[in-house]
Structure formats: structure tokens, C-alpha cells
Amino acid sequence: MKTRASKIKPLSLIWLVVLGLSLCCSISAAVEERDEDNGKRRSTAEDFLQLKVRPIAIGHHGVGPNTGENPALPIENTVESVRQAYSLGARVVEVDVQLTQDGRLAVFHDDYLSDFTCIHTLTLDQLQQRLPFVPELHQVLAVARHFNRKAIDELDGILIVELKASSPHCDPTDELEQPVVSAAVREVRQSEMADQVIFDSFSPALLFLAAQTAPEIARELDISGLQLLTPEQVHAVTGLPVIVINKKISLGLTWAEIGPVFRLPGYASVQQFLATGMATSVRVVGGEMDFLGPAEQQQPGSGTAFVEAAHSLGLRVFADPANSEADWNFFSSLGVDAIYSVIPLGVQLQPVIPDL
């Protein structure tokens, strides 16, 4: 998650358009699950989405971003980072996944390594020879399942899995979307965690495929400030070439490749973003700091209006990232439902979560 832009087009929410969107993603009542072993209530992603208190902390990559620069913390997206996040009180944790050459899902942020070797050109064994700490998704799912199953009538062990849009560098022909989605669905179903997982992405194409492949798994569509800029503005901000492309699954959007790093859609307006969320039947929309922060600076109240517009459509709103109390307080002031945060900071700042 995690682009940065220095400015954003002013947001003017057109309520007539927003409120006219279909409420096809109506919220259903949470289904109570019972653990086969002890008959106790198992919490679900639906329980999380139905909470009345807010904002709830989401462990960002586990206890927080760390690629090794902070030896006091576990490396991000590792089993230990995820385990620590749950142990420190995070009820929900987020990780990123990448597809390897042999069809396995590695938990890692980018689809290439520091020397630009693409992960999908390596088998899992080859990747782990270079980076022994990189786990498979099923290992992280097992950690989440452990915390979910041991919790008695309380929310715990919910996992958000970010499906990363492939970079033009590693997927020049744009062919990896369905394999990534299929692998993620397979792992989640085999772990019997479909009710405890939310698929998350900046790519509505990935979420469209996820909805077709596994409609039972909840989904979240994210937006960064970069996606509300024109191609010319993106080039000015990033210094990277911007090439508009013909996307097979375009969903009526203009897609572009930004240098060798990003392949994402642009949105003409916030209304178009929300409409895309509804079209892909997501339960959640997520806003980056580089979207919500400049929006509030340029047009005070526009961030709150975005949250209210999403809520009026039955959507939950998550924000990312809160690496300080000031970040948390800013997001909280907008009325968001959950915040991707470093742990334990987010746990300390979130409200008391009621039992199920």
C-alpha cells in the first residue's frame, strides 16, 4: 500500500451521483460459526465489518512495516510479525502476497527483490534460499486460525490478504492476475478461513476476478492519491513515464503503467472510485494518507464527506497508514471504521471491542 503523491485534485462529492448508486452490496447479518471441537463461537470477517465501535486497529504487515532497518522488531510480513501483532492485541492483521514460479504464494510486499529479480521467476525454495524469513500464505493463515479458534465469543484472528497488482517490470504481458487470485482462493479455502479473510487490492480487476472465483470472501478496494491525478500530473509528481494501456479487464476505467513499478487505474473522481467499488461488490473501500491528507488540506471536510458517501452506500471505510498518534487521530476524525497501524500503538488507541 503505498504510493505517495504531493498533491491531489480538489474533491467535490456529487451526492446525487453517489446516492444514486445501487445498494447491491447490502450488509447481511453475521453468520454464527461454531468450532467443531468445542462448540464455541468463532468470529468472522462479517463480525469485524458489523462492529459499531470505531476505529479498529489493523496490524499493518504484522506489527508494522520493517524490512530489517529496525532490529528491535520482526521483519514485516513474517510469521513472527503476524504472531506478535495478534499477541499484542490486534484483532485484525494484514499481509501482502506474491506468486512464485511454482505456483506458491509467498508473503512479501513487492513482486521483485532489491536487485529487481521478479519473485514469479523463482520457486519458493529459491526465494527462501535468498530470504529465509519469507513464509507461505498458508503459514500465516495457520497463525490467524490459531488465534481465531482459541478466542471464545470475541473477535480475533481476522486476516486481510492484499492481492498486489503486478508491476510492468515483472508481468509485462499482464497475465498473472488470475493465477494469483486462484492461488489465494485455494489457500484460504484449504485453511478453512474463508469467513475470516478479506481480500484487499488497489486493482479492481483483481477484485473482480476474486468476486467471480470466491464470492464468499469479502473484498476491499483501495485508492491512493496518485490515482486521482491525470497522466501528466502523475509524471510530474513521480518523474516516471506514464503509458496508457488497453486493459483486458478495464471495468470502464483508464489504466496506465507508471514506469516499471505500477499498473493501476485512474479515477476521474471519487464518485467513479465508489462506483467501481460497488461494481466489484466490495464491502470496504480504503483510503491512503496521500489521498485523504491532501484532500482535507485543499478542501476541508472532503475527507469526512468521502467517508459519509461510502457509508451511505453500505460500505465500510479503512485508512492507511497510521505510524503515529497524530496519524491515528487524523483518520479517526474523519469517521473511518478501521486504520492500518503499527502495533501496539493502534491497539492502545482503539476503543474497547465488545464481545460477540
Residue ranges and their predicted role:
Residues 1-8:
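N-terminal secretory signal peptides that target proteins for export/translocation
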Residues 9-19:
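Sec-dependent N-terminal signal peptides
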Residues 15, 22, 26-356:
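Phosphate-group recognition and catalysis centered on beta-loop-alpha active-site segments
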Residues 8-10, 61-62:
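Hydrophobic alpha-helical segments, especially transmembrane helices
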